[in-house]
Structure formats: structure tokens, C-alpha cells
Amino acid sequence: MKKIEAIIKPFKLNDVKTALNEIGIQGMTVSEVKGFGRQKGHTEIYRGSEYTVDFLPKIKIETVLPDAQVPQAVQAIIAAAKTGKIGDGKVFVSTIDDAYRIRTEEQGDTAV
């Protein structure tokens, strides 16, 4: 099993969700997060004063999948989230040792 974490632009969430649904992936956790990378922050003017906004709003999508589904899921996320501009985001893939479904006590791939 692998965990996919994708950090994307907020307005791309529906596109990514649709792309994952089209390949049969429905379970995911979505969080509003803030951060910066190469994009860095930007400057805003509020009531005549200039402020530097270091952290930019992003969306974090997490899903755990069987190994066989990972390449297709990663490609779907990239295709749906990509604008070609700085700040499109990142996709991280990590190994999950085990998973448990609390309600039924299923374990491993069947719990996902």
C-alpha cells in the first residue's frame, strides 16, 4: 500500500477529485493548508500599508491505495492539477505498513 499526498492550488480541487473518481478512486481526505516553495509569497496592500504574505493557501489531498493503482492515480492528479505555472504543487508517495478499518476490523488492502 502507498499513501499519496498532493498539495495543489485550491481551485483545482474539483478537477482532481473528478479525475480520481474517473479511475475508480473515491476515498480521500482533503485539508486546507498553507505553505510556500519556489513560488514564495506575494505582497498585498491593506489600508494603505504593504504586507508580505509568506504562506499561500493550498489544498492537501491524501489517499491510500494498493500499489498497482498508484501510477495511474499520480498521473491523474498531475494532469488535473497542472496549469504550467509556478505553484502548481507537489505529489508525494510513501509506503504504508498497514491499515485498519475501525468498524469492521479489516486489515491491509481490504481496509482501504
What is each residue range found by the language model?
Residues 1-112:
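Positively charged, small/polar-rich N-terminal and surface patches that mediate targeting and assembly
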